[in-house]
Structure formats: C-alpha cells, structure tokens
C-alpha cells in the first residue's frame, strides 16, 4: 500500500475501449466519477498500440464504485464499455508505484518532441491540464529543504563560543589578574603598600603661620 490507497478496492478494470483513446483522454473521461490517481492502458509489446483495456486507480473506493455503476455497459464512441472492480493479482503495490519519466523532451504518448502528453495532438478529447498536485508537492519539498538548511545553519552557529564574548571574558580575566598581582605586590612590600595607601589619603600640612588649626591639602 502507498499513501493510504487500497488499489484492490479502488481500481476499475475497463475493457472494449476505443483503441484511439490516450491516457489523457481516459483521465478526462473518468475524472467525472472522482479523483483519478493513475491510468494504465494495456498496449501491444511490439506495436505499442492500445488493446482497448485499461486499469483506472481512483483515490477512494466510492469513486471506483461510482465509475462502475455509471459506465458499465454504457456506449462510448459507439462501443459498449465494460467496467468492473479489478481483481487483485498480488501486484497492487507495483501498480500504484509512481513512475518517473526522466526524458521530458519527448511526448509519452507519441514519442515526438516539442510537446508533452498533456498536449499531444493524438488526444481525442483535446489538451488536459497538468496535475497541480505534483507542483504543490515540489513546492512543499523546497520549503522543507529550506527549513532544514536554516536549522543546520542555526546548529552550526551554536557550536563553540561567540568570538566577541570570548574576547570580553579574556579582558575580564586579564583585568582580574592585574588586580591580584597588585594585591600580592603589596603583601610582599608593606612599606610600598603603606606609601601607596598614604598617597591616596588626604595629607596634613602645617600652615606657614603659627596656628592651632591644621590645614588640609590635596
């Protein structure tokens, strides 16, 4: 199973289809019954021409049942169409697996260049709008990739310390070391320490004239 799909219950087997109908034609025909996930036309191995048989995978079993009720034994381009719920042969997972067509320069239907299968001239019912769902998925993947890149950048920035903060811590440590050095110096030389302390204290000097008051000088 993939994406919650149940191909054994939501796949319609359609036969007696006009050989000229393309994959895109069938998409347009069956889309009236519900969301079509995939259309597979059985083709001759040698001629690559349609055998008039197709498997149509719907998004849900209700749409598949609506298709069977609405299309079985009905006339389509002058042919009586047979439609029934397909029997699971054990290859359901393989059937719904997404195929990637790397060569976008050629049409999947006719093999010519200059157009894609959605606009192939062999489409009896005209051009079909390319599915928008795939484009949304691509956009979503791009957004997710951008978010992952941002997360990676944020994580890389968290590794190690900020150089500015590192310089500040070094400056503080250097200043603290100088203070400690001065304190140790005063301990070893009390006279110098007292001299230094005296230099910070206000000095008392006597006035040039005799007085009982002392004069303070800076």
UniProtKB/Swiss-Prot annotation:
Residues 10-88 form the RRM domain. PROSITE patterns: RRM, ZF_CCHC. A zinc finger (CCHC-type) spans 105-122. Residues 132-188 form a coiled coil. One of its GO terms (molecular function) is zinc ion binding. GO terms for cellular component: U12-type spliceosomal complex. It is found in: Nucleus. InterPro entries: Nucleotide-bd_a/b_plait_sf, RBD_domain_sf, RRM_dom, RRM_dom_euk, ZCRB1, ZCRB1_RRM, Znf_CCHC, Znf_CCHC_sf. The keyword Glycoprotein does not apply. Residues 144-164 have a biased composition (Acidic residues). Its main location: nucleus. One of its GO terms (biological process) is mRNA splicing, via spliceosome. Residues 178-201 have a biased composition (Basic and acidic residues). CDD domains: RRM_ZCRB1. Keywords: Coiled coil, Metal-binding, mRNA processing, mRNA splicing, Nucleus, RNA-binding, Spliceosome, Zinc, Zinc-finger. Component of the U11/U12 snRNPs that are part of the U12-type spliceosome. This is Zinc finger CCHC-type and RNA-binding motif-containing protein 1. It comes from Xenopus laevis. The lineage of its organism: Eukaryota, Metazoa, Chordata, Craniata, Vertebrata. The gene is zcrb1.
